[in-house]
């Protein structure tokens, strides 16, 4: 199941460069995750890298 970013996103940009599948991009007001591209960092890390760096803790399970 893919992750998604909630409205609590502060648009800081910390998550985007952490994504190994380039599933995260800047939306109009918050960052967004492309569910078709997100694999929760399987094969790259033990847990989702974006979740680990998000200061607003707004990246959650979809």
Curated annotation (Swiss-Prot):
Binding positions for [4Fe-4S] cluster 1 per the UniProt entry: 9, 12, 15, 54
Cofactor binding note from Swiss-Prot or TrEMBL: Binds 2 [4Fe-4S] clusters.
Record keywords, A-Z: 4Fe-4S, Electron transport, Iron, Iron-sulfur, Metal-binding, Repeat, Transport
Cofactor: [4Fe-4S] cluster
Domain of life: Bacteria
GO MF terms, alphabetically ordered: 4 iron, 4 sulfur cluster binding; metal ion binding
Keyword Cytoplasm: no
Binding residue positions for [4Fe-4S] cluster 2: 19, 38, 41, 50
Keyword Repeat: yes
4Fe-4S ferredoxin-type domain span: 2-28, 29-62
Function, in words: Ferredoxins are iron-sulfur proteins that transfer electrons in a wide variety of metabolic reactions.
Annotated protein name in UniProt: Ferredoxin-1
Source organism of the structure: Chlorobaculum tepidum (strain ATCC 49652 / DSM 12025 / NBRC 103806 / TLS) (Chlorobium tepidum)
